[in-house]
UniProtKB/Swiss-Prot annotation:
Keywords: Chaperone, Cytoplasm, Stress response
GO cellular component: cytoplasm
Domain of life of the source: Bacteria
Xref: HAMAP family: GrpE (MF_01151)
CDD domains in UniProt: GrpE
Subunit annotation: Homodimer.
Organism of this sequence: Staphylococcus aureus (strain COL)
Acidic residues bias (residue ranges): 42-51
Main location: cytoplasm
Biased composition (Polar residues): 13-23
Alphabetical list of Pfam families matching this protein: GrpE
Family: Belongs to the GrpE family.
Protein name (Swiss-Prot/TrEMBL): Protein GrpE
Amino acid sequence: MTNKDESVKKNTESTVEETNVKQNIDDSVEQAEESKGHLQDEAIEETSDENVIEEIDPKDQKINELQQLADENEEKYLRLYAEFENYKRRIQKENEINKTYQAQRVLTDILPAIDNIERALQIEGDDETFKSLQKGVQMVHESLINALKDNGLEVIKTEGEAFDPNIHQAVVQDDNPDFESGEITQELQKGYKLKDRVLRPSMVKVNQ
């Protein structure tokens, strides 16, 4: 082979090699571009996912805030409801006490009038006019006592009962063999209660 042919061969090989290198470079560039494109697509997808998350998070936060507010309002409502129920019970109890005290004052003022009526009924007389008048007074007395009993008035039991300093007032001591020691032998003045309240203790004679 001549020097010329050898030179041509080398040039040809160099050209082929350059072409291959260029092709490899082009392929690498293309692959790099494709990889870059994939990375950009993935970045876009990740960005989209982040946007979705960013869009969801505020909603969840708002829901949590509303739930917390609802819980707080429910707690306030239950507390206010309990306070209102306690207030109603307290007012009802105060009204009942006030009614009792009002009735107590009225009945206490009436008791002397009842005593006078009962003393008048103890007077004896043979005159028909007197008897008729006494019968009318007795009917008034019974009606008054029944009306007062319907409103809680109660006569305190005395004779034969054991002396109770909470409802009885001992004014005289007695020595009666027909009664046990500490028993009431005689009632000197009637005592009255209004439900569980003593309006006036009974004045009694107590056996020794």
